[in-house]
Amino acid sequence: MNGLYLGIDTSCYTTSIACVEEKSIVLDERTVLSVPLGGRGLRQSDGLFQHNRNLPALLKRLYASVNPKRIAGVGVSAAPTGAEQSYMPVFLAGILTAEAIAGALSVPLVRTTHQRGHLRAAMYGGNETLLEKARFLALHVSGGTTDVLEVTPGNGLIETVRPLGCSTDLHAGQMVDRLGVVLGLPFPAGKHLEMLAGDAEEKDIRLPSSVRGTSCSLSGAESQAQRLLQGGAPAAEVAYAVYDCLARTLVKLIHNAAQETGCDTALVSGGVASSLLLRRLVGQRNRFGLEIRYGESRLSSDNAVGVAFDAKESLCSRKP
């Protein structure tokens, strides 16, 4: 199928649309949801309201840049992950918009997941060669997910995503955001906490990294970081320790998953993975010689680029 493919993603953090063609990104538009200072996120009803308010403006930009008649298919994140009970009301805004556009244009609609979108976005560029592998590991590290996955490509697309493990309590992004809120940083706090960590003069604080097999626990590390801040520890040094803890945790998870599956490559995706500091620390802590890949930093945070590519590849694989 030649033409353009539209992707729509309405997550807990961002309203996103994207348009792709072959292997290139034609359009990538996003609006971050507004969270009051001091807040730890939005209620689903508030997020849904903001998506409905944001989508018309984003679609106006789409139609100003792209001839709708060139759109050959539409993809939408219909759920957070592929798990059977995975559901969040915020995705309804994207689903209804995608259904309306696909119906008006008489083009097929592909329902995918937010997680698959992240994985596919992280493959954009040089990592698309992973689709040629028999299997590879993936980590989806964000405010709502800290998942260890085994991905099986097939027929030029992501065929299956098998969960191997996860965080048993806090997600990595939650840990970052909670400490950021305590420090008075805007939500989501990732880029602000990373900037603060860059000011650390001493790097001796070591938060516990709790990993069992392919699952982890971050609540203990978060509690200790909170106590350190309450005790007067320098904020920048605690911020650095958070990223160091996450780096050690991710390396352990990848190593254990590699031992379990025999996969030799891991792709790290999700908003937390956009941190250049985290990437550097993971490289320093990777004493196992693991091949750890990342997507472009701009495509690690919530976006619809991966959703659009996933839809394109799904539809093209159906061609007779």
Annotate each PLM feature.
Residues 1-3, 107, 111-136, 310:
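Conserved phosphate-binding catalytic cores of ATP/NTP-utilizing and phosphoryl-transfer enzymes
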Residues 2-26, 135-152:
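Gly/Thr-rich phosphate-binding beta-strand-loop-beta motif of the actin/hexokinase/Hsp70
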Residues 11-49, 157-163, 294:
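Short glycine-rich, Thr/Ser-proximal phosphate-binding strand/loop in the N-terminal lobe
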Residues 60-99, 103:
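Short beta-strand-loop/turn "lid" adjacent to the catalytic site in phosphate-handling enzymes
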Residues 68-79, 261-272, 293:
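Short glycine-rich phosphate-binding loop at a beta-alpha junction
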Residues 116, 152-201, 228-232:
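Glycine-rich phosphate-binding loop plus the immediately following alpha-helix
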Residues 118-121, 295-320:
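Glycine-rich phosphate-binding/hydrolytic loop that grips phosphoryl groups
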Residues 191-266, 272-283, 287-290, 312-319:
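A contiguous, well-structured pocket-lining segment that forms one wall/lid of small-molecule binding clefts
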